[in-house]
């Protein structure tokens, strides 16, 4: 059950990326948990070209640069406590990736979002001025991501 809750919590964090990153509503879950060549989310056009590659967590520089080469746009959503250390180590290595945007979800907000994870859930999402409110019918979590690059 703990692994299931972790997976659901990660997908809750993906729920944050969906409303902030799409203007066409065509992002789809990929197979990143079991397919190393795929992101967490992506948007492909009808020619199967990757328009937008979305990573969640702290990918290494090789993965970020690979994504940058394959997609028109790459977004990383980092949510761990160690994000500042990870980003300090990664900044210079990915500086030439001009199509890369990196966001940090503050730790407290990420934990509150993860706490919404249930086996079965419905979430309502509102976005205004870069702030996201996610509600599960009982609890509302406010997320204000911090842009690290892009």
Positions of predicted regions on the chain:
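Acidic-basic catalytic patches of nuclease active cores, encompassing PD-(D/E)XK
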Residues: 1-33
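Short connector loops at helix/strand junctions that flank enzyme active sites
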Residues: 24, 36-38, 49, 69-71
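Conserved catalytic cores of phosphodiester-cleaving nucleases, focusing on short active-site segments
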Residues: 41-43, 50-67
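Short amphipathic beta-strand/extended segments with alternating polar/hydrophobic composition
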Residues: 51-57, 140-148
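Short hydrophobic alpha-helical runs that function as membrane-insertion/retention elements
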Residues: 55, 73-78, 101-103
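An exposed acidic His-Trp-rich patch
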Residues: 60-85, 89
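Domain-level recognition of nuclease-like catalytic cores that cleave nucleotide substrates
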Residues: 86-140, 145-146
